[in-house]
């Protein structure tokens, strides 16, 4: 469930599972499950490591897919006999590149500001992008200054303090069912 939730919520996740040795995969038994087939519908990508010299590339691609475009879950299946094999020296699977911060074009910001100021009853629906962008403080200041109510998704729960007068809590929480009416 956690992997499927991460994928549907757009949260980057790399799940690594253990597996029987490759020499036992052809034998029908209670210890072997085709995990790559199981994870296929709930991940962006799933791969089994069958040779130690491919570990670096498989791990690198798992993280790349998990973090790219719409983030989500990926899966790596590791048979026990392959996990025990030495990985070639110098294999460094992850080279994290820090992307330069991107900002919206001034015209886009001005257009958005115009729409907000012209709106009769604006409301902000805050999602996981606020969390990933580390923008909770800025969102709270923006909403408070402009007196705009904020509803957050489950993945952004708490990005605006619940005691803030403009917090309309989390959409989908039964105790506070007024979010759907506001939207």
What are these regions (language model features)?
Residues 1-183:
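N-terminal alpha/beta PP-like core and its mobile active-site loop of ThDP/TPP-dependent enzymes
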């Amino acid at each position: 469930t956690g992997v499927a939730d991460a994928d549907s919520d757009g949260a980057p996740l790399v799940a690594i599972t253990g597996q029987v040795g490759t020499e036992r995969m052809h034998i029908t038994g209670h210890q072997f499950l085709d995990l790559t087939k199981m994870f296929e519908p709930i991940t962006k990508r799933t791969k089994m490591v069958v040779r130690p010299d491919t570990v670096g590339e498989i791990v690198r691609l798992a993280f790349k897919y998990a973090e790219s475009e719409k983030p989500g879950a990926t899966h790596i299946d590791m048979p026990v006999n392959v996990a025990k094999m030495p990985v070639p020296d110098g294999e460094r699977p992850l080279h994290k590149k820090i992307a330069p911060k991107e900002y919206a074009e001034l015209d886009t910001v001005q257009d958005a500001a115009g729409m907000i100021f012209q709106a009769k009853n604006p409301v902000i629906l805050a999602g996981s992008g606020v969390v990933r962008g580390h923008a909770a403080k800025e969102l709270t200041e923006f909403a408070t200054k402009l007196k705009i109510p904020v509803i957050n998704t489950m993945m952004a729960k708490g990005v605006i303090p619940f005691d803030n007068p403009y917090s309309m809590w989390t959409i989908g929480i039964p105790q506070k069912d007024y979010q759907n009416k506001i939207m």
